[in-house]
Design a protein with these regions (language model features):
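C-terminal motif of bacterial Sec signal peptides marking the signal peptidase cleavage site
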Residues: 27-31
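Catalytic-loop region of hydrolases
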Residues: 33-120
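Accessory cap/linker subdomain of secreted extracellular hydrolases
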Residues: 51-55, 60, 66-67, 245-339
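Short, surface-exposed "cap/lid" segments of acyl-processing enzymes
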Residues: 102-160
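Alpha/beta-hydrolase active-site loop
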Residues: 181-203
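Primarily recognizes the serine-hydrolase "nucleophile elbow" in alpha/beta-hydrolase
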Residues: 196-265
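C-terminal catalytic histidine-bearing segment of alpha/beta-hydrolase fold enzymes
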Residues: 330-331, 357, 364-416
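Short beta-strand/loop motif that positions the catalytic acidic residue
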Residues: 343, 348-355
């Protein structure tokens, strides 16, 4: 990972203007898995109230505060700064907030909160927690840093509904430590704790506990885990619906499918992320020396550049053992597979039938599994749509589904 000096220089160069959330960048790549281990569900976390975070000017370096901060509870806000120059009908805040690692350590996570203009209604505003797709593992890939993001099209429908829009970067993206890519517990905690952060800001956001979770690709995986974890990890939140777009699932199947895929660099990213999250996940058990050397690029560049780097080599040059056949990797593939526990809310799964990254059959198998355990779930597929291309065509139906959940209507289910 880049050293502290490199990280701070990059952040100061990006500055505070032109952020525009970086949300679209988050959609481009598939998600990884997370852990559904007992550690993720047994945490005794509690609600947080309004706090007194450090207030920063737009040109100050918020991320530097993640290097040294006072202990706090999940969701408490460490620092906040208003972001100028973003063309949305609301106020954009960049935040640094407390969350919890898989091991239970207090970690600082960055993200974005967008607050609609005007006064909040009686009872507070509903919250939409957005979980982004794969951007990379390097600090510079954190969406809240991105000056060219064009997420206005995603944000505006929720601002029009007077909802607070929150978007986590996830643990280790923009902040110290390697990002635990595809580690469900870490992703889920970050996704829930930024809702707590919005609530902790009190009248500044007017956020209530009523929450909808939405994510695509890696983010689809993240919100499925957040939904599974919510009742135990964040019981004060009222999660009413979860929308998972093209979520990575059936991880053992996907790991095998990536063997001859141009997206096989996801194997390297996942190996790096799980090695960061799980001390026993020895890289040499799954990666060749060349594959391990290429992880230097994982820590320096973002997803698009990683694809070009890994595509120069054949699978056999990078992978020494099939992760399905060596421990603890085989177990981690299962533990980080979503859909084994009933979540707090009904689930809508969206998938393009021409998805080139996450096989569309995987979400059908996921629905079958979720039905077997009693999870209310509906799956909608879109003919001719790709991994990221499905987002636009599915948006009107998704918004209708969210509106119905917020209105208290019962959700349809594919389960007999």
């Amino acid at each position: 990972m880049p050293n502290g000096a490199t990280r701070v220089t990059a952040r100061r160069r990006l500055g505070g203007v032109g952020l525009a959330l970086g949300v679209v960048v988050l959609l481009a790549a598939p998600a990884c898995n997370d852990d559904s281990s007992d550690d993720g569900e047994a945490s005794d976390s509690s609600a947080v109230g309004p706090s007194a975070p450090v207030e920063l000017a737009p040109d100050e370096d918020l991320y530097a505060l993640a290097e040294d901060f006072q202990p706090g509870e999940p969701g408490e806000v460490i620092a906040v700064q208003e972001v100028e120059g973003v063309d949305v009908d609301g106020t954009v805040l960049r935040v640094l907030y407390h969350s919890e690692s898989i091991e239970g350590d207090d970690v600082a996570v960055s993200g974005i909160i967008v607050v609609p203009d005007g006064d909040a209604p009686v009872g507070g505003r509903n919250v939409l927690s957005w979980a982004h797709g794969t951007t990379g593992i390097a600090d510079k890939c954190a969406p809240s840093l991105d000056p060219s993001g064009a997420g206005v099209g995603l944000v505006e429908p929720f601002l029009e509904r007077d909802m607070v829009f929150v978007a986590t970067d996830y643990e280790g993206l923009g902040t110290p430590g390697r990002h635990p890519y595809i580690a469900g517990v870490s992703e889920g905690r970050g996704t829930l704790d930024i809702v707590r952060a919005a609530i902790a800001l009190g009248d500044r956001t007017g956020a209530s506990e009523r929450t909808v979770l939405w994510g695509h690709s890696q983010g689809g995986h993240a919100v499925l885990f957040a939904n599974q974890m919510a009742s135990d990890y964040a019981p004060e939140l009222d999660v009413v619906g979860t929308v998972a777009g093209a979520p990575p699932s059936q991880l053992p199947l996907i790991a095998a499918a990536l063997r001859d895929s141009p997206y096989r660099y996801y194997l390297g990213m996942t190996a790096a992320g799980w090695n960061a999250a799980y001390p026993d996940a020895d890289l040499s058990l799954v990666l060749t020396p060349l594959g391990i050397d290429l992880l230097d690029e994982v820590d320096e560049v973002c997803a698009g550049e990683l694809g070009a780097a890994w595509s120069r080599y054949e699978y056999e040059e990078l992978i020494t053992n099939d992760p399905n056949e060596v421990e603890p990797w085989a177990t981690l593939l299962v533990e980080n597979d979503p859909g084994y526990e009933v979540g707090a809310s009904p689930v809508l799964i969206i998938h393009g039938e021409n998805d080139e990254q996450i096989p569309v059959v995987s979400s059908q198998l996921l629905v079958t599994r979720m039905c077997e355990i009693g999870q209310d779930v509906e799956r909608r597929t879109y003919p001719g749509q790709s991994h990221a291309g499905v987002i636009g065509p599915s948006m009107p139906e998704m918004l209708e589904w969210i509106d119905a959940r917020l209105a208290g209507e019962a959700a349809a289910s594919d389960c007999a």
